[in-house]
Amino acid sequence: MTGSDAGYSAYYVSTGSVGLTDGDYVGVTSYSTTVGSYTEGTQGYQMSDTDGIMMMNTSTVSAVDSVSLDLFVQSTSWETSDYITVSFVGTTTTVLLDTNGYDIDLDFPTYEGAWTTVSGAVSGTGYLSVEFSSNAATESIYLDNIMFYSDGLDLDLDDDNDGYLDVNDDCPFDATEYLDTDGDGYCNIPVSYTHLT
């Protein structure tokens, strides 16, 4: 990713309910009555009363070491069927927050009614995914200030690309060798003897 802004895509998964057809709010908004103000600028991303599963995914970014976003969870009565999952999806998935199967009121009360920064260490190339499921008009979340961080170092853990990590490779710069079985500091180079005549 170059520049300072990442794009995003939104997806909806129907669970057999009325979905977003009953006047629900989803998307970029400047509506701030619930949140007071946004943490970065005058707009944020809102998901409310989805009556299904709503997902917002950022565009893919490279060489990421950590990620953060600001999350506002509306203070209301939540059920265990409502959930918020925040993940970084790359070669592997790093879950930063998962309320699935919990009651947000009881198990995540500090998230309600205030902006909370959700962050974590991640690695490599991937995208941030926020998944939200709720079934009441008072159940809303707001997202803002999504940030990807990188120290700028792209570590090459296998310098000779022979499939053995440098920490396990006695010959990290020789792709044809990886062992030094006698410990003399020289790789196990096959020796061929020829007779001199």
Mark where each language-model region is.
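Extracellular calcium-associated, cysteine-rich motifs in secreted modular proteins
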Residues: 152-196
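Extracellular glycan-recognition surfaces and repeat-rich motifs
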Residues: 1-42
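Extracellular carbohydrate recognition
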Residues: 133-150
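Extended, low-complexity, turn-rich repeat/linker tracts enriched in Gly/Pro/Ser/Thr and Asp/Glu
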Residues: 63, 73-81, 136-138
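Extracellular beta-strand-rich recognition modules
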Residues: 67-75, 126-134
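Short beta-strands within extracellular/lumenal beta-sheet-rich domains
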Residues: 45-62
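Short, surface-exposed beta-strand/strand-loop-strand elements in extracellular ectodomains
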Residues: 83-88
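Extracellular carbohydrate recognition and processing domains
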Residues: 93-124
